[in-house]
Structure formats: structure tokens, C-alpha cells
């Protein structure tokens, strides 16, 4: 009789504890769901990431990239740019270093030495001056591409400045940028880093319940033309790169009216 009582007591205790654990797990799941829902206003979510043709997506705290080992650079870099991020902190400029998160190894900065090309940021350091860690993270070699100096400091700089203007206008934008790699014949350095003939940049913003975008395709050379002369459709860039830039946003169109 005593043995039966003990067995019943142990069984009740077991199921009681199990139910308590299950309740806690449900609460945690609900809390996690709540946090997830609270973050849906941010454009910087995986829902906005382009597809990767290389399957090597590298996530840093403030930007994400898809690394293309064959060309020794990212095929795209994507990041959120908020109006609140636009600061002018005088951070000390760090040295470029290899990206420890790139499993195949990102190119050494010495490939650019005496090449005649700038180490052109894809996610600009100037967009990340709100935080020292964010700023320093832009100096990984996975975030650079060979750019002609007149291009880097000229027309491309004007596109970057306009991007910051749009961040202020819309308060929060999403940027995807990179080089057109598949037709890049010229290489630099011992690791044969490809030199893109063109660079692209897509800016996405939310206007009410709708999304709107503008896309640029700019030759890797200086130009005195208006940046609007280089506006193209997102479909044009997708055909050139094989990348689906916003797979979760159906019927997204880009235009000069941004």
C-alpha cells in the first residue's frame, strides 16, 4: 500500500513539474514572438536581404554581405541607414583587416597596394560614424572593392551623399550595393581581386504602407553627369548579377521619383 502511494506521489510530482516546464516554455515562446513583432518596424530584417548566389552570407552587427570567393569581394552588402545614424564623429581611421567571418578568407589589403585603385568601401565608413564599433567594422576587406580614385571621390561620392539625404528624408532606408562582378576582366594583386566595370546601389524606403526604391548603375570612372542619368530598373541589375534583390517584396518598382 505504501509502495503504491509513493508511486502515485512521484507520478503526480513528475507531471506537475513537466506542466510547469511546459508553461515556462510557452511563456518564453510568447515573449520571443512579442520581441519579434516589436522589431517589424525596422527595415533591417532578414526579410529584406537579397538572395546569395554563393551561399556565403556574412552577418556583422550593422551590415550583412554575400562574399564571392571567385572575385575576392562581396557580390552585395546590405545595411539599414537611419537618420539618427548620421553623425560626424572624428574616429581614428583603422587599418583594413581580413574578415574573420568569411570562411574562405577575404582578400588581403596588400592586393590593392600600388594597383592604381582605391580600397573603395561598399558600406561607407561615413554611414557608420554613429558608433565606433560600427565604424571599425567597415574596414574589413570583405567590404571593399577596387575603385578608380576619380570615381570613388567623384560620382560615387555624390551617390553616397544623396543616399544620406534620403535617410534624413525618410528617416529609415535600406541600402544594397556592390560591383557588377561577372563581366570584370581586370584583376589586381596576387589573389587576383576582380575590378568591376560598374557599381550599383539600390535604396529602399517605406512610404506609408508601400515600399519605393531607386537603383543606380554607374561605370567605374569619373563623370560630371547627374546621378539621375544612371538610374536603372532593379530588373536590369537582377539580369546582370543573377541576384533577386528583394525576393519577399513582390511587384517592387524603382523610379527616379524617389
Could you tell me what each predicted segment is?
Residues 5-14:
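Sec-dependent N-terminal signal peptides
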Residues 1-2:
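N-terminal secretory signal peptides that target proteins for export/translocation
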Residues 17-258:
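Domain-level detector for secreted/extracellular nuclease and nuclease-toxin modules, and
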Amino acid at each position: 500500500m505504501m509502495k503504491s502511494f509513493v508511486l502515485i506521489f512521484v507520478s503526480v510530482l513528475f507531471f506537475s513539474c513537466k506542466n510547469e516546464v511546459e508553461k515556462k516554455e510557452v511563456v518564453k515562446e510568447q515573449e520571443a514572438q512579442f520581441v519579434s513583432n516589436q522589431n517589424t518596424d525596422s527595415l533591417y530584417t532578414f526579410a529584406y536581404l537579397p538572395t546569395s548566389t554563393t551561399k556565403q552570407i556574412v552577418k556583422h552587427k550593422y551590415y550583412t554581405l554575400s562574399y564571392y570567393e571567385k572575385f575576392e569581394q562581396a557580390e552585395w552588402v546590405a545595411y539599414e541607414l537611419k537618420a539618427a545614424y548620421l553623425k560626424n564623429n572624428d574616429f581614428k581611421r583603422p587599418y583594413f583587416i581580413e574578415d574573420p567571418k568569411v570562411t574562405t578568407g577575404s582578400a588581403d589589403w596588400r592586393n590593392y597596394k600600388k594597383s592604381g585603385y582605391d580600397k573603395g568601401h561598399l558600406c561607407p565608413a561615413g554611414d557608420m560614424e554613429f558608433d565606433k564599433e560600427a565604424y571599425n567594422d567597415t574596414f574589413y576587406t570583405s567590404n571593399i572593392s577596387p575603385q578608380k580614385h576619380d570615381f570613388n571621390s567623384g560620382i560615387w561620392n555624390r551617390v553616397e551623399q544623396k543616399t544620406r539625404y534620403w535617410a534624413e528624408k525618410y528617416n529609415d532606408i535600406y541600402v544594397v550595393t556592390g560591383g557588377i562582378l561577372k563581366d570584370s576582366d581586370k584583376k589586381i594583386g596576387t589573389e587576383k581581386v576582380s575590378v568591376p566595370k560598374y557599381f550599383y546601389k539600390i535604396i529602399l524606403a517605406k512610404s506609408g504602407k508601400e515600399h519605393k526604391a531607386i537603383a543606380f548603375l554607374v561605370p567605374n570612372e569619373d563623370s560630371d553627369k547627374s546621378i539621375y542619368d544612371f538610374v536603372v530598373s532593379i530588373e536590369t541589375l537582377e539580369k546582370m548579377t543573377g541576384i533577386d534583390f528583394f525576393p519577399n517584396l513582390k511587384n517592387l518598382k524603382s523610379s527616379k521619383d524617389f
